[in-house]
């Protein structure tokens, strides 16, 4: 049965016990918005609300933006699509503080990381570090992919539990979406049974930055535990990230969550140091010398690679070109990281047959168009 640690200080924490469960691939990490720091230092929710200008009294697309984070759109389809595109742009920004935390987290030997967020900042970080991973996400009321690769610490599963921004129809943005999502979870429609078995077989869950104060989180925890006696009884380690003692008592008693007085940034740093002392951090791959030796290509030559269906090679050449022009190229480097991540995710979805064949060329062409635009901008760097 999964175990947890009782409330203690970070200096007294039994890191060896956590490391043992990590090494045994029996420790699952759950991430929420509290792990993030948005550009400018705001919380993720505050920054996203500003980005979407939700305070407008006559917002053209959003009729109501609730405190629980759910939207009511003026037009359910067209306005939802517009706001989804804005949210995608928001997460495509550079998140330097969050990326720094994730760079430490990516080197920890978790075999499964479950995110309640829809973004791909963590997988972008894995890409930047050259670390292996497998991405997947929950798509409510859709059949899960037939293929399932067992997660491993050298190739962890990064699983977006409430949809992925690259698949807009999978996102949970409205109350209606959420109740559809709960129905899908209740009927066990869209999560691969082998993944559920992996979650049931864990010895420890670690919760970081989850929305304990939101009304729907309690409901989500209950529904997630309905199909397994093991999941109902799982004990969890979580950080004491809120001040309401009644709420803490509720989670401690109802959900067997034991709280640890810390915050995500400190906890990740402390666990990183403990893993470093124990010699279990993942080793970062050495830079590919072939990439450094790639010649600079002109914009016309890069576009010719794209025209010849050599998109991946064009991305590699553009990366080498931009790397040689830092710091002037930093903003374009970040844009290319986002684009490369989107390309890799699209390839993964194609291989796993989780994308409609009609959508594949459309999304590929969108990536190519953005790549061509980056090439044009890079040409100005000389």
Please place each PLM-identified region on the residue numbering.
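Short, charge-rich amphipathic alpha-helical segments embedded
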Residues: 313-349
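SIR2/sirtuin-family catalytic core signature
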Residues: 1-29, 35-39, 100, 129-131, ...
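Death-fold interaction domains
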Residues: 347-382
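Conserved small-residue packing positions in alpha-helical repeats and bundles
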Residues: 301-302
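Hydrophobic/aromatic side-chain positions at a characteristic register within alpha-helices
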Residues: 306-307
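Active-site gating loop/helix substructures
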Residues: 133-200
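Gly/serine-rich nucleotide phosphate-binding loop at the start of the catalytic core
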Residues: 1-106, 111-114, 119-122, 132, ...
């Amino acid at each position: 049965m999964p175990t947890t640690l009782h409330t203690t200080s970070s200096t007294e924490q039994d890191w060896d016990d956590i490391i043992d469960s990590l090494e045994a691939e029996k420790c699952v990490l759950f991430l929420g918005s509290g792990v993030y720091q948005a550009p400018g230092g705001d919380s993720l929710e505050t920054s996203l609300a500003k980005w979407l200008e939700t305070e407008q009294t006559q917002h053209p697309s959003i009729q109501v933006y609730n405190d629980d984070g759910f939207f009511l759109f003026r037009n359910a389809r067209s306005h939802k699509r517009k706001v989804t595109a804005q949210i995608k742009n928001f997460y495509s920004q550079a998140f330097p503080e969050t990326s720094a935390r994730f760079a430490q987290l990516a080197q920890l030997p978790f075999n499964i990381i479950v995110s309640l967020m829809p973004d791909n900042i963590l997988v972008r970080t894995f890409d930047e570090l050259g670390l292996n991973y497998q991405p997947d996400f929950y798509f409510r009321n859709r059949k899960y992919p037939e293929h399932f690769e067992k997660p491993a610490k050298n190739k962890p599963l990064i699983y977006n539990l409430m949809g992925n921004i690259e698949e807009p129809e999978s996102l949970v943005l409205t109350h209606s979406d959420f109740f559809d999502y709960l129905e899908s979870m209740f009927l066990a429609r869209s999560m691969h049974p082998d993944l559920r078995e992996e979650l049931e077989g864990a010895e420890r869950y670690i919760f970081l930055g989850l929305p304990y104060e939101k009304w729907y989180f309690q409901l989500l925890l209950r529904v997630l535990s309905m199909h397994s006696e093991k999941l109902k009884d799982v004990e969890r380690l979580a950080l004491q990230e809120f001040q309401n003692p009644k709420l803490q008592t509720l989670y401690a008693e109802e959900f067997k969550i034991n709280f640890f007085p810390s915050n995500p940034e400190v906890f990740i740093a402390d666990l990183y140091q403990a893993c470093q002392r124990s010699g279990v951090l993942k080793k970062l791959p050495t830079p590919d010398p072939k990439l450094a030796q790639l010649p600079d290509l002109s914009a016309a030559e890069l576009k010719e690679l794209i025209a010849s269906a050599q998109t991946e090679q064009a991305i590699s050449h553009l990366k080498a070109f931009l790397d040689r022009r830092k710091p002037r190229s930093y903003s374009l480097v970040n844009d290319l990281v986002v684009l490369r991540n989107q390309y890799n995710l699209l390839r993964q979805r194609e291989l796993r047959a989780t994308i409609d064949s009609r959508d594949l060329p459309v999304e590929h062409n969108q990536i190519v168009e953005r790549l061509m635009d980056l090439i044009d901008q890079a040409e100005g760097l000389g």
